[in-house]
Curated annotation (Swiss-Prot):
GO cellular component: cytosol
UniProt domain comment: IleRS has two distinct active sites: one for aminoacylation and one for editing. The misactivated valine is translocated from the active site to the editing site, which sterically excludes the correctly activated isoleucine. The single editing site contains two valyl binding pockets, one specific for each substrate (Val-AMP or Val-tRNA(Ile)).
Residues where L-isoleucyl-5'-AMP binds: E552
Oligomeric and partner information: Monomer.
Keywords for this protein: Aminoacyl-tRNA synthetase, ATP-binding, Cytoplasm, Ligase, Metal-binding, Nucleotide-binding, Protein biosynthesis, Zinc
Top enzyme class: ligase
Organism classification: Bacteria, Bacillati, Bacillota, Bacilli, Bacillales
Localization, UniProt: Cytoplasm
Sequence motif 'KMSKS' region, residues: 593-597
Gene expressing this chain: ileS1
UniProt EC number: 6.1.1.5
Organism, scientific name: Bacillus anthracis
Name of the featured protein: Isoleucine--tRNA ligase 1
Entry binding sites for ATP: K596
Cofactor annotation remark: Binds 1 zinc ion per subunit.
Motif residue range(s): 'HIGH' region: 57-67
Length: 921
């Protein structure tokens, strides 16, 4: 007889190799056929809502690792929530207006100047939709479950109409105004920028010290002194109209040879060293407040420079006398306004100096630095020129430096509701907790929000102007424009004359002739996405405002988290979110930012094509995403290894449940052996731990808990010794069915627990599980931890056994290395444990040689009675010897009972019995 045919070896069709790049698209087709998103929504209908609101990625180009990290994290949460008693809709969105799309078309050769604005905008819309389609397919490939057929897209008419309503609401409350103010201006984009659109990079700049001669000392100064200012922007000097000093600072009049200079007293030593003064002496000191209204002369123009008081003056750098150009700085503007100075801004949209800067007109601002410095030298006003490298604001899109420039812009003032904004921040749950401080400080310190842009591709600012120049924003005009946009899209603004955009028969006292103009500026894209709480959460029946969670990269504190909060509090008085979670950026394996120049860009598509979406998702779960995270081939290799371990565990469990029918073969918990119940306790601990980790968005804890359970609790212990029972005993042996009962519970629970992270794999495993009826594991709930009555006692006893077992394994390893035995089944072990461990071993009813995977087990005396040469460990001394007897052909145990049964000469007594009872007719 072929004894190998009497072994119940694992049997399953579930493939060993994942082959995810091929298998996942097939699984996604199956999901599409069963309308998985709608099916899950239907299945969870009537449950409490959990709304994670998608911050819209910008529709331009392929998705990058930051997108993948973001969307996968969101998917973990939404999938988990739908398996724990919630209805968790997920509506993806796209941000589709703005400069990058205009630039992309220009780069493709679109001749913008040869077409109308409306025609150009149509091309922008087409391009944006193409990008949405491209990204949608890539997000789907990641396995993200979403309402892909009904996303929100910021260029869609219904969305734009709601955005107009938000603007109108804010205007009605007095939060929207037009004013001339210095704003961040990008000469390369030819548009104003919001704070969220700037990034800081190092830039080399001229650092100059300039003397301004006193013209009128107002009886405080004698008139022969000179104020010294310091600046790193010489190009702004043609716009200088004043000098600011701090009212509380003490200023020194310093005599250097025949000159007298005015600087802040506490900066005397620093300035003296920088300007290489020798024999400098302070001849007089005055308080800053006394210098108010003294007048200096502009160094190269025939005009005055008024000395004013400003709290913005510091002694961190410079001289304590600050060059003030109201057209080129926020503080300068505020101080200048207070003193009635004009707002002079001799720089045009392209960053070129105008005729208001005589002698330098036609020069690009950065190119004007040199001739202006030369002019200062020529008139004897330049005291020092050096070059410094400092952090300077740049346009986040063009990566070129920006300037402060006063222009007429539309602003949203947050002053009137700053207190409510700060209260809303305090009421929100922030993860990580430092997010609260970060946004609080931003809101506390931020100025008015410049919401206008001088571009073509965006939502128009819905303002009309009367003949006398009065801006017109009324409920009537706002509602009418919103209706027009809802019906025709915002392009109608560029296709029709102002009068055709106004309500029928509209009149205004400022337009006696019935003539009107329309605003040509568009809204900042942050106003677009920042209106999504109104356009999406409030408008869609399947969602609600406030959302439970906003989850984006940490750059969104100044972006979407901020703009959404501002518009929501302005319109509703409340935050649009209950909770905010932020993640870091994706770096390469060495912790460097990814860039084309370094050539270290990792692309999601490549990972999915080579390894699969579930490997990328498993990587996301493995990292501490709240900080910056790393990815590389080596890191992915480690993750793929963990995936292999998890997959092999599933395969082993399925293979050993091939003949198990849950309805017939399940053993009641009370009838299970202790070691089996101990495994259930470990499983329940895992369920509790994993669910708690999901609840707190700690996905790395989920990853480690599942990996450890598969490798330590299952592979290294339970599954290892169980093979001797599963393969060797008869199919219906009580111990075998007991183990299968445990394996079944483990398999079902484990499949559900990994579903949010590995949905493709979980749904691949699911139909192989005996007795399941649901079409997809996604239509089930997370497993519940079942508390066994004797759980604590089991844990205490069997945890102790596991520590003792570790000692035994060490001893077997030593014996193997010393060639005492070949494999552990060749061994006979005698233990000399501590008193505590001896009592524990004596209380175990299970076959201990099976648990230790040896052929013979003996309990000697106490530890102190062990032979002198016996290796001693923490809990026991262990004597390892070669087991006596022969090796059974069927179970490989070394036994002295081989051949006792004459019919089965090569089998041990146990195997002979099993064969006779189950296989001999």
């Amino acid at each position: 007889m072929e004894y190998k045919n009497t072994l119940l070896m694992p049997k399953t069709e579930f493939p060993m190799r994942g082959n995810l790049p091929k298998r996942e698209p097939a699984m996604q087709e199956k999901w599409a056929e069963m309308n998985i998103y709608e099916t899950v929504q239907e299945h969870t209908k009537g449950r409490p809502l959990f709304v994670l609101h998608d911050g819209p990625p910008y529709a331009n180009g392929d998705i990058h690792m930051g997108h993948a990290l973001n969307k996968v994290l969101k998917d973990f949460i939404v999938r988990y929530k739908s398996m724990t008693g919630f209805c968790a809709p997920y509506v993806p969105g796209w941000d589709t207006h703005g400069l990058p799309i205009e630039q992309a078309l220009t780069n493709k050769g679109v001749k913008r100047k040869e077409m109308t604005v409306a025609e150009f905008r149509k091309l922008c819309a087409e391009y944006a939709y193409e990008q949405v389609e491209r990204q949608r397919e890539q997000f789907k490939r990641l396995g993200v479950r979403a309402d892909w057929d009904n996303p929100y897209i910021t260029l869609e008419p219904a969305y734009e109409a709601q955005q107009i309503k938000v603007f109108g609401d804010m205007a009605k409350k007095g939060y929207i105004y037009k004013g001339q103010k210095p704003v961040y201006w990008s000469p390369t984009s030819e548009s104003a920028l919001a704070e969220a659109e700037i990034e800081y990079q190092d830039k080399k700049s001229a650092s100059i010290y300039v003397a301004f001669s006193v013209k009128d000392g107002k009886n405080v100064l004698e008139g022969d002194e000179k104020y010294i200012i310091w600046t790193t922007t010489p190009w702004t000097l043609p716009a200088n109209l004043g000098i600011s000093v701090h009212p509380e600072l003490e200023y020194a009049i310093v005599k250097v040879n025949d000159e007298k200079y005015i600087i802040a007293s506490e900066l005397f030593e620093t300035v003296a060293k920088t300007l290489e003064w020798e024999n400098a002496e302070v001849v007089k000191t005055v308080k800053g407040s006394e210098l108010e209204y003294t007048v200096a002369k502009h160094p190269f123009y025939d005009r005055d420079s008024l000395v004013m008081l400003g709290d913005h003056v510091t002694t961190d750098a410079g001289t304590g006398c600050v060059h003030t150009a109201p057209g080129h700085g926020e503080d300068d503007f505020i101080v200048g306004k207070k003193y009635g100075l004009e707002v002079l801004c001799p720089v045009d949209d392209k960053g070129v100096l105008t005729e208001e800067a005589p002698g330098f007109e036609g020069l690009f601002y950065d190119k004007a630095n040199k001739p202006i410095t030369e002019k200062l030298e020529e008139v004897g006003a330049l005291l020092k020129l050096t070059f410094i490298t400092h952090s300077y604001p740049h346009d986040w899109r063009t990566k070129k430096p920006i300037i402060f420039r006063a222009t007429a812009q539309w602003f949203a003032s947050i002053e009137a509701f700053r207190k409510e904004l700060l209260e809303a921040v305090a009421e929100t749950k922030w993860v990580p907790a430092w997010g609260e401080t970060r946004l609080h400080n931003m809101v506390r310190d931020r100025g008015d929000w410049c919401i206008s842009r001088q571009r073509a591709w965006g939502v128009p600012i819905p303002v009309f102007y009367a003949e006398n120049g009065d801006p017109i924003i009324t409920d009537e005009t706002i509602n009418h424009v919103a209706d027009l946009f809802r019906e025709h899209g915002s392009n109608v603004w560029f296709e029709r004359e102002a009068k055709d955009l106004l309500p029928e028969g509209f009149t205004h006292p400022g337009s006696p002739n019935g003539e009107f103009r329309k605003e040509t500026d568009i809204m900042d894209v942050w106003f677009d996405s920042g209106s999504s709480h109104q356009a999406v959460l409030e408008e869609r029946d399947d969602l609600q405002r406030p959302a439970d969670l906003y989850l984006e990269g940490s750059d969104q504190y100044r972006g979407w988290f901020n703009s959404s909060l501002s518009t929501a509090v302005a319109v509703t008085g409340k935050a649009p979110y209950k909770g905010v979670l932020s993640h870091g950026f994706v770096l390469d394996g060495e912790g460097r930012k990814m860039s084309k120049s370094i050539g270290n860009i990792v692309v999601p598509k490549k990972i999915m094509d080579q390894l699969g979406g579930d490997i990328l998702r498993l990587w996301v779960s493995s990292v501490d995403y709240q900080s910056d995270v790393r990815i590389s081939d080596d890191i992915l290799k480690q993750v793929a290894e963990v995936y292999r371990k998890i997959r092999n565990t599933f395969r082993f469990l399925l293979g050993n449940l091939d003949d198990f029918k849950p309805s017939e073969n399940t053993v009641a918990v009370a009838e299970l052996r202790e070691v089996d119940r101990y495994m259930l306790v470990k499983l329940n601990d895992l369920i509790t731990k994993v669910k708690e980790a999901y609840e707190t968005y700690d996905f790395a804890a989920v990853y480690h808990a599942i990996h450890n359970f598969c490798t330590i609790d299952l592979s290294s212990f339970y599954l290892d010794f169980a093979k001797d029972i599963l393969y060797i005993e008869g199919a219906n042996h009580e111990d075998r069915r007991a183990i299968q009962t445990v394996l079944y519970d483990v398999l079902v629970a484990l499949t559900k627990l990994v579903t949010p992270i590995l949905p493709h794999t979980a749904d691949e495993v699911w139909p192989y599980i005996p007795g399941v009826t649901e079409e997809s594991v996604q239509l089930t709930d997370m497993p519940e931890a079942v508390q066994l009555d004797d759980a604590e006692a089991l844990k205490t006893k069997w945890d102790a056994f596991m520590t003792l077992r570790d000692d035994v394994l060490k001893a077997l390893e030593v014996a193997r290395n010393e060639k005492v035995i070949g494999k552990s089944l060749n061994a006979s072990i005698t233990l000399y444990p501590t008193a505590e461990m001896k009592a524990m071993l004596e209380s175990i009813n299970e076959d201990l040689k099976q648990l230790f995977i040896v052929s013979e087990y003996k309990l000697g005396g106490m530890m102190e009675e062990a032979p002198a040469d016996a290796p001693k460990y923490e809990h026991t001394a262990v004597v390892v010897a070669q087991a006596t007897g022969e090796t059974c052909e069927r179970c490989w145990v070394v036994s002295e009972t081989i051949g006792k049964d004459a019919e089965h000469e090569t089998l041990c007594e146990r195997c002979a019995t099993v064969v006779k009872e189950n296989y001999v007719k």
